[in-house]
Design a protein with these regions (language model features):
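ATP-binding/phosphotransfer module of carbohydrate and carboxylate kinases, centering on a glycine-rich
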Residues: 1-66, 76-79, 97-107, 119-129, ...
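Short beta-strand segments
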Residues: 9, 67-73, 134-140, 144-146, ...
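Short hydrophobic alpha-helix segments
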Residues: 30-32, 86, 155
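A charged helix-plus-loop insertion that forms the helical arch/lid used to bind
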Residues: 81-91
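Generic beta-strand structural signal
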Residues: 105, 130-135, 139-143, 147, ...
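Short loop/edge segments at beta-strand edges and connector loops
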Residues: 109-111
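Adenylate-forming
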Residues: 117-122, 143-145, 164-165
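Structural signature of FAD isoalloxazine-binding scaffolds in flavoprotein oxidoreductases
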Residues: 158-162
Length: 313
């Protein structure tokens, strides 16, 4: 019986790696820099070297390894083909076949947000559930949809791109994707800050935020907890947009639980309770009791999800 597996989370600045037992026990984690020079051609070389070195260091034979699972910051088709990965400089190629040939081990790949959602379902905030939607509120808004324990990636690997649900009809500013009115423009860490600056410029009511040199999502939520009316308006607006988007998703896939993660989620239940309030207001009545949980694995969700990709469970 194979005893070990590797989980890999490729980010724009670092590649996170984990060696696991097949029961989900994390034995060791580490990271290396993401070398994006020359269209990221060194990335898989570095991953292959790290895996080979770790096997030698731990005296683990390849026959004892179930495989390697990878989260990639871009769409990945069902056969392991990266369709485009701007952050890494990658064009279209099959990452599973390429890395598998380099290390002589089975490889499975998926979009990083989907893979992180799989990790949270397995060992994190979604543990015990089979139908999970994860929303990651960071620099952008990512998402992952898990139904019956399986990632829903869709035809083009774009399933779960929650951040690009349209929530504002007449927005003039453009989202990073090139469209307008996307959830990511308002619910990401950068989006919340941008919205705060807009509100401060048109609403002259007193606010702690006016005294802060560098406004962040954290300072906004801290001010809201302290009773700042303008900050609370920002949190309510954020909660309404997220709640509305999740209500739409619930009509399509009817999850058991929404798992909220990413840096913005550090606001904790203050944020979750506002999202839930607007979710219940907007959701189809049969879906109103969907649970909300905070993510628990933090930056390790990607490596947990990676190894879960290659486990036959």
């Amino acid at each position: 019986m194979r005893k070990y597996g590797f989980g890999i989370d490729i980010g724009g600045t670092t590649i996170k790696m984990g060696l696991f037992k097949v029961d989900g026990t994390l034995l060791e984690k580490w990271e290396v820099d993401t070398r994006k020079e020359e269209n990221g051609k060194s990335i898989l070389d570095d991953i292959a070297k790290e895996i080979k070195d770790k096997l030698e260091e731990k005296d683990i034979h390849k026959n004892d390894v179930v495989g390697v699972g990878i989260g990639v910051p871009g769409p990945v088709s069902g056969d392991g083909t990266v369709l485009k990965c701007v952050n890494l400089g990658w064009g279209v190629f099959n990452v599973e076949e390429t890395l598998s040939e380099m290390i002589d081990l089975p490889v499975k790949a998926g979009n990083d947000a989907n893979v992180a959602a799989l990790g949270e379902m397995w060992q994190g905030g979604g543990k015990g559930y089979k139908n999970v939607v994860m929303v990651t509120l960071g620099t952008g808004v990512g998402g992952g949809i898990i139904i019956d324990g399986n990632i829903i990636s869709g035809t083009n690997g774009a399933g779960g791109e929650i951040g690009h649900i349209k929530v504002i009809k007449n927005e003039t500013e453009t989202c990073g994707c090139g469209k307008t009115g996307c959830l990511e423009q308002y619910a990401s860490a950068t989006g919340v800050v941008k919205e705060s600056k807009k509100l401060l410029s048109i609403d002259d009511s007193p606010s702690i935020l006016r005294e802060i040199n560098v406004i962040t999502a954290k300072t906004i939520f801290d001010a809201a907890k302290d009773g700042d009316k303008l900050a609370n308006k920002l949190v309510e607006d954020l909660g309404e947009k997220l709640g509305s988007a999740l209500a739409t998703i619930s009509c399509i896939c009817d999850p058991e639980v929404f798992v909220i993660g990413g840096g913005v989620s550090k606001a904790g239940m203050v944020l979750v309770n506002v999202i839930r309030k607007y979710y219940i207001e907007k959701a189809f009545h049969a879906c109103e009791e969907t649970k909300f949980e905070l993510a628990k694995l933090g930056n390790d969700a990607g490596i947990y999800g990676g190894v879960r990709l290659v486990l036959n469970i």
